[in-house]
Amino acid sequence: MIIPVLDIMNGMAVSGKSGKRETYIPLKTIFHPSSNPYKIANALKDASAKRIYIADLDAIENRKPNYDIIKKINQELPVMLDSGVNTVNKAEEALEIAEKVIIATETLQSIDDLIDILDSNNKDRFIISIDIKDNEIFSKHLDMDIEDIVKKMGEINPPEIILLDISRVGTEKGVDHAIIKKFLKLDSSLIIGGGITSKDIEELEKLGLNKFLVGTALHANKLSI
C-alpha cells in the first residue's frame, strides 16, 4: 500500500528535501493545479488512496497549527497526523481531528512521555515514528542509538511503527535497507518512508513489508497509488 504524504505549512501543501523546512516551497502535484491541501487530498482519494500521512509543519515548529484544514481532510480521507505531539494534552487535541496520531522521535522529550501518551487512549490510534537522519536517531531530546530504540520498541510493542529517513525525504535516493532490517524482528507493523523508489518497494515487499510513505515520487507521477 502506498500512503500519500502531504506536508502543510501556512495553510498550503509544500514540498522540500531532507527536512530543511526553511527551504520548502508550494507543492506542485499531478493531482491538482493548486497547492490547496484539501483539494489535493480529495484528488488523492479519487485516485484510490485509502489513508494519508500529513505533517503539520507549523504545529511541529510550535506555530499556529493547521487543524481546521486537517479536520476537514480527515472527514474525506483517514489522516495519519504528525503535529509534533509530545504530551498527553497535545495527543488529545490531535485525536479530535485525525484518525491516527503520530508520536515522532524528533519532538518526543522522553520515553516516559511516550508511555504516558500511549496509556492515555486506545493504543491502536497511535503510530510511533522513528526518525532517522544520517544513519542516526533524529531527536531534539532523546539520546538513543538505533539498537536502543529497537530494544525499547520491542518492550512497548506499538501496533505500527514508521521508519522515516528524514535525510532522504524528497531525494528519491532510496531507503537504507540495513537499518530497516534491524526492525524486522519486532511484532509491530512497519511503514517505510523517505526517498522511496519503485525498486525499494519491489525489494522490501520480498521482506514482507507492504506499507510505504511516498511524497515526491507520487506527486511527480513517478509512482502510482
Could you say what each language-model-derived stretch is?
Residues 48, 76-77, 93-102, 120-126, ...:
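Glycine-enriched alpha-helix->loop->beta-strand junction motifs that scaffold or abut catalytic
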Residues 2-8, 52-54, 79-83, 101-103, ...:
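Hydrophobic faces of well-ordered beta-strands that scaffold small-molecule active sites
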Residues 97-113, 162-168, 193-225:
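Glycine-rich phosphate-binding active-site loops on the catalytic face of alpha/beta enzymes
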Residues 32-45, 87-92, 142-153, 201:
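Short, acidic/polar
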Residues 18-62:
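N-terminal beta-alpha supersecondary unit
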Residues 8-30, 98-169:
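Conserved anion-binding
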Residues 64-71, 141-150, 172-181:
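Charged helix-capping and loop-helix junction motifs
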Residues 43-94, 177-179:
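N-terminal active-site wall of soluble small-molecule enzyme domains
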